[in-house]
Amino acid sequence: LMDVDQPELSIVFGRTKRRVDELTRGLKLRGFRAEGIHGDLDQNKRLRVIRDFKNDQIDILVATDVAARGLDISGVTHVYNYDIPQDPESYVHRIGRTGRAGQSGQSITFVAPNEMGYLGIIENLTKKRMKGLKPPTAQEAFQAKKKVALKKIERDFADEAIRSNFDKFKGDAVKLAQEFTP
């Protein structure tokens, strides 16, 4: 989903400290710049992670509700509720982290079949109906990642220092193209 959405700055909420650690580890393994915060972290580590998030050193903050209380971070484009919150007010608090200061934002909540009734309670509280989404296909995720890679190459080649050394990169580019051609 993140491969396709390409969020600029996002917060992923997990219900427990263990879930936050699992999600952070998984996102890092997939190449995302992610860090987690929860109640077991010492204050210095929490402050460092929040500072890094605000300063674009990390793109994804994974957090429990308690650890995220009081955070005021602008520019969050996506909120992912990996675990549905335990109370409807927490949901409102979570989604309020995106789309601030007149900016648009998106909130995505993962819901298990046995949680659908609870989702209805949240919809009644927020007075908004949530629409179901189909997960992106592997092909859609691949195409999105390819698009990002091509944009990075274009951006890099806009740099005169790189462009002037194109001949040095040409052989590597041809080799990569041959190596990864299906």
What is the meaning of each model-derived region?
Residues 1-182:
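Conserved helicase RecA-like core
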